[in-house]
Amino acid sequence: MRGRKLDGSWADFDAFEWGGPYCEGNAWHYNWSVFHDVQGLIDLTGGDERFVAKIDSVFALPGIVKYGTYGTKIHEMLEMELAKMGQYAQGNQPIQHMIYLYSYAGQPWKTQYWIRQVMDRLYNSSENGYPGDEDQGGMSSWYVLSALGIYSVCPGTVSYTHLRAHETGAYL
């Protein structure tokens, strides 16, 4: 995802730069924001293999932060750095669904692996148990739905991605 200028031309671009066309994030976070047409995004990326490789790169890249239009480090930047998961920023909503996109490209085991990593490494039962601010229940709903093995990649729809639950039972 890349911003455009008012005249329709492409804006200068640095995928690690925060701000500008990206609210509290960068291009690595917003690249996956085609909730309504994941298959179209996969096709645009070059197919399943290239799509999966691009998701893999989010975790493999260094946690580089360029302040961009913010001019200083904001808490979302710090949270991403502290997580030590490359450019993956669980502490901010725009990328939280990305892990589930592995399943759309035929690799649900990677979805399972990274969900477990995020749940085990970034959440705990202390007063600081979320990897960022709660933002209208975003952190807790991601955790609960992921623990139950369901997730709505496209908000506002009744379509859910189903995976193996991480919990053996739940009362709803």
Where are these regions (language model features)?
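A glycine- and small/hydrophobic-rich beta-loop-beta segment
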Residues: 69-72, 97, 108-121
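Structural helix-adjacent loops and short alpha-helical linkers that scaffold large soluble proteins
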Residues: 42-53, 103-115, 155
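Well-ordered alpha-helical scaffold segments within catalytic/enzyme domains
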Residues: 34-46, 97-106, 145-150
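Conserved small/polar residues in nucleotide/adenosyl-binding loops
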Residues: 161-168
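Catalytic cores of carbohydrate-active enzymes
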Residues: 1-93, 134
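Catalytic cores of secreted or luminal carbohydrate-active enzymes
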Residues: 107-118, 135-160
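Acidic, glycine-enriched catalytic cores built around paired aspartates
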Residues: 127-131
